[in-house]
């Protein structure tokens, strides 16, 4: 599972454990449990069982024939993470972490959520494994994603609306971490992305790499060769890290992460921490952040609630610095256009997050030859976004 660039919780200069002493004990306990679990065939078998029987894996790698024909360039395949139980890639990681929580004897799980997809996945897993569940969500995100708030409550979770700061994902993470520190003995913090202090970025990636492992097997079966490009959206970066990781050493495969440019990267309304950020520390890790000269985190914005995080996973920061992956961005408008385009051209309504990856693909594919292959990670379905779309009144 390990690549040579990992060094005790760091990816080059990124990552680490910038946390108070009270949290270090819990992180050490977590790391030890995770390291034992991933070498235990019984744990791996149980994890794979639930991925298949409960979540419905493997997800298809679908040849988007209409999209390919309309754009007139490379062959486009869609990795259909939207077809997972709960409608996104988040469940891959949640099932792994909740199984780990059970193994560690924890009674309660807590989590943060932005778009609500991770919260729904945690509430789902907690219901299945009969564990108490509390989800922290920014007040602004609760408003934008009211459907997911209701889903979490139906599943038996308590949803706490966080009213501090910008009332979005960053503030939800802060509150969840604070509560975890207060209840470390019996509580497991289910981190939703490849962010936070070590071992979370590594652990979440290892639970998400199933996306890339399946993609590699599927594309070789369908095409007899690896793709030329893999494209995925990046907020914290777990769907992208999950599909990128098994291809990191396949140098012929170009890895492209797409951030949210919001109203434009030259405005103060975006969430492109790779394009416009600088290195700093947030939520226990060193990475690229959107911050001022004093190191204060600045407000971020995206039409997509799952991408408005002011940082990025440390492994992504490392892949950027070493030029193994390329990071770009698209605006709200481009993502909304792609959302409508895929819906009408393939009958697949993608999440607004995934629509960012799709928007960049729509720019790139026409410039490529018909022999080239592009895989786009459709990280989630767009049902959760119909409220947002309705407010924007785009489709009448």
From Swiss-Prot:
Q: Write down the SUPFAM superfamilies for this protein, in alphabetical order.
A: Tryptophan synthase beta subunit-like PLP-dependent enzymes (SSF53686)
N6-(pyridoxal phosphate)lysine-modified residues are 90
- Record field: catalytic activity: (1S,2R)-1-C-(indol-3-yl)glycerol 3-phosphate + L-serine = D-glyceraldehyde 3-phosphate + L-tryptophan + H2O
Q: Lipid metabolism among the record's keywords?
A: no
Cofactor(s) needed: pyridoxal 5'-phosphate
Which Gene3D superfamilies does the record match to this protein? 3.40.50.1100
The record's keywords, sorted A to Z, are: Amino-acid biosynthesis, Aromatic amino acid biosynthesis, Lyase, Pyridoxal phosphate, Tryptophan biosynthesis
* One annotated GO molecular function: tryptophan synthase activity
GO CC, alphabetical: cytoplasm
Give TM segment ranges.
none
Which one Pfam family would you cite for this protein?
A: PALP
Domain of life, per UniProt, equals Bacteria
Cite the InterPro entries for this sequence.
Trp_synth_b_CS, Trp_synth_beta, Trp_synth_beta/beta-like, TrpB-like_PALP, TrpB-like_PALP_sf
**Which EC number applies?**
4.2.1.20
- Pathway assigned in UniProt: Amino-acid biosynthesis; L-tryptophan biosynthesis; L-tryptophan from chorismate: step 5/5
Q: Quaternary state and partners of this protein?
A: Tetramer of two alpha and two beta chains.
**Described purpose of this protein according to its UniProt entry:** The beta subunit is responsible for the synthesis of L-tryptophan from indole and L-serine.
Protein family membership: Belongs to the TrpB family.
Q: Which PANTHER family match?
A: TRYPTOPHAN SYNTHASE, TRYPTOPHAN SYNTHASE-RELATED
Put simply, this protein is called: Tryptophan synthase beta chain
